[in-house]
């Protein structure tokens, strides 16, 4: 079942941890592409210097962060890599969770084509399919078109994984500093990156 609106409400750090083990789904040309979320980062504007919304900064790009929880915030880095975030916290509190890595599940052939333009790939390439925010967006076909989209729809959503199938029993959740935020002064050290320790698709050990 799809995660209901209430799933995205509450403390952003708790929502981040709840997202681990759930499935990110995107339907592209009628074909389901998905992956189990294995790594996330929480961003808690306006006080978090690593957040795009630090200081209440409100731009065309960040406007969706000030909206209702349970919407997609997609942006570009280096002018070419998309990053997918889930908006959390009440309206007016610009916070969200970056999805950093997935374990691919559905639409593997389409994911391989999206990443490598071929379906015959090496084991190393397979592990590289979705082990980073830009990689997973390319794999699942997530672009700026999805910015601001409600996750209460059939095309793009979070699918809750039944307890008996959830991988949380196999991996320990570990917290640590977020990645590539050297500009963020004291926020560099906040342990707001959560991931399954030892999972092969985690972007950075």
From Swiss-Prot:
Domain of life: Bacteria
Key words of the record: DNA damage, DNA repair, Hydrolase
EC number: 3.2.2.-
InterPro entries in UniProt: Formyl_transferase-like_C_sf, MPG, MPG_sf
The keyword DNA repair appears for this protein: yes
Entry's Gene Ontology molecular function annotations: alkylbase DNA N-glycosylase activity; DNA binding
Similarity-based family: Belongs to the DNA glycosylase MPG family.
Species name: Bacillus cereus (strain B4264)
Entries under SUPFAM superfamilies matching the protein: FMT C-terminal domain-like
Enzyme class: hydrolase
GO process terms (BP): base-excision repair
Protein name according to UniProt: Putative 3-methyladenine DNA glycosylase
């Amino acid at each position: 079942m799809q995660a209901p609106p209430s799933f995205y409400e509450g403390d952003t750090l708790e929502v981040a941890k709840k997202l681990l083990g759930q499935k990110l789904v995107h339907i592209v040309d009628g074909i389901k592409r998905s992956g189990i979320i294995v790594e996330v980062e929480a961003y808690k504007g306006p006080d978090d210097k690593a957040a795009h919304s630090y200081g209440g900064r409100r731009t065309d790009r960040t406007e969706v962060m000030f909206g209702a929880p349970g919407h997609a915030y997609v942006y570009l880095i280096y002018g070419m890599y998309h990053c997918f975030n889930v908006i959390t916290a009440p309206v007016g509190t610009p916070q969200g969770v970056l999805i950093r890595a997935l374990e691919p599940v559905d639409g593997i052939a389409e994911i391989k084509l999206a990443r490598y333009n071929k379906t015959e790939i090496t084991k190393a390439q397979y592990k590289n399919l979705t082990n980073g925010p830009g990689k997973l967006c390319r794999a699942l076909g997530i672009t700026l078109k999805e910015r601001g989209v409600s996750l209460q729809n059939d095309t793009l959503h979070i699918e809750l994984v039944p307890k008996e199938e959830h991988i949380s029993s196999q991996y320990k959740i570990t917290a640590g500093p977020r990645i590539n935020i050297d500009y963020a002064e004291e926020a560099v050290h906040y342990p707001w990156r959560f991931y399954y320790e030892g999972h092969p698709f985690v972007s950075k050990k």
